[in-house]
């Protein structure tokens, strides 16, 4: 019979072994993830006002 608790403990043990193997601590992992997220979203927060000037308003034709 499948025991969910045993399965969860096994996954936790595997994660601990992986973290010990790569010498990744939880606080280092948090810093790593936050820096990756900052790098991914940096292009979205960059302001390109010159591109906004080139846009033209959309014209609506009413019947």
UniProtKB/Swiss-Prot annotation:
Pfam families registered for this protein in UniProt:
bCoV_NS6
Q: Give the keywords, sorted.
A: Host endoplasmic reticulum, Host Golgi apparatus, Host membrane, Membrane, Virulence
InterPro entries for this protein: NS6_bCoV
Q: Which GO terms describe its cellular component?
A: host cell endoplasmic reticulum membrane; host cell Golgi membrane; membrane
Q: Where in the cell is it found?
A: Host endoplasmic reticulum membrane; Host Golgi apparatus membrane
Q: Which domain of life is it from?
A: Viruses
Tell me more from the record.
Answer: Bat coronavirus HKU3 is highly similar to SARS-CoV (SARS-like).
Its job = Could be a determinant of virus virulence. Seems to stimulate cellular DNA synthesis in vitro.
**Which family does the record assign?**
Belongs to the coronaviruses accessory protein 6 family.
This one is known as: ORF6 protein
Which source organism?
Bat coronavirus HKU3
Its ancestry begins with:
Viruses, Riboviria, Orthornavirae, Pisuviricota, Pisoniviricetes
């Amino acid at each position: 019979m499948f025991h969910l608790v045993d399965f969860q403990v096994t996954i936790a043990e595997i994660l601990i072994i992986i973290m010990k193997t790569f010498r990744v601590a939880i606080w280092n992992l948090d810093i790593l993830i936050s820096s990756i997220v900052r790098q991914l979203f940096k292009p979205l927060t960059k302001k390109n006002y010159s591109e906004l000037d080139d846009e033209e308003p959309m014209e609506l034709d009413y019947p």
